[in-house]
Amino acid sequence: SVYEHTANALRHLKKNGCAPDLTQVGNEITFGMLWPTAKTDPFNEKNWDVLADLLKSGVRACREVCPNARLIIHTEHAGDWDATKNYYMRLRNHNVDYDIIGLSYYPMWHKDIPNLSRTLDSLAVDFPKKDIMIVETAFYYSHDNDKWAKSKDEHSDLYAISEDGQAQFTKELVDMLKKHPKVTGLYWWFPEENESGKKVIGSWINRGLFNNHTGKVVKAMKNFADYRSNND
């Protein structure tokens, strides 16, 4: 069950001295989880009672095993305000307990930074008791036509696909997030990707904070660290 799986995983972490400060039930679950059983849609009530029950089971395990950890519910449509709002409204209507709204934000899929800023403004108004975190973000510093990246042209109109372009994106994102007091965390997706990354996922994604070709830290690392220096 979701409860047993979650509780066992957390007990294992605690036993080994790694009790988390944050927990998250599900990953990018705008459209539910454990398909088809709990497949959902933010615009349709179908299966939401099932999803809510599964989330409540996971939440109960988190609260019991790690009572001091704050709990995130993580979705991946930050570029679509209606979908984001509907999702968290349905959580509210089904009385799902959590602390933090977690969002994935990738500019190549979720529109530009001003659009994300508007979503954050609206979340702060409609869900004032919830903190917000960007729990996944990244952008390219290189493009090797890998299986995840689609085409280079698809993303090059946002920022240059280069270390400078990645650094510009990171700086603009951090500068914007600092203006939103409800945002309390920023996490880079797969920052540790390096020259051995192909062994992990089968290809290079080239969105980490180490250059796959040189093994050196990319320029965006400094911009990313600027967020933490203002939010300790």
Give residue spans per PLM region.
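Aromatic-rich peripheral "rim/lid" segments of glycoside hydrolase catalytic domains that contact
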Residues: 15, 39-45, 118, 122-129, ...
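Active-site neighborhood of glycoside hydrolase catalytic domains
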Residues: 4-8, 40-100, 118-130
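Feature marks short, surface-exposed loop/turn motifs that line or immediately flank catalytic pockets
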Residues: 29-33, 79, 107-109, 141, ...
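Aromatic- and acid-rich polysaccharide-binding/catalytic face
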Residues: 19-21, 27, 73-75, 84-114, ...
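An active-site-proximal structural segment forming one wall of the substrate-binding cleft
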Residues: 1-25, 50-61, 87-94, 167-180
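Non-membrane alpha-helical structural segments and their capping/turn regions in soluble enzymes
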Residues: 1-7, 45-56, 81, 110-117, ...
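Active-site groove signature of glycoside hydrolases
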Residues: 6-45, 72-74, 183-190
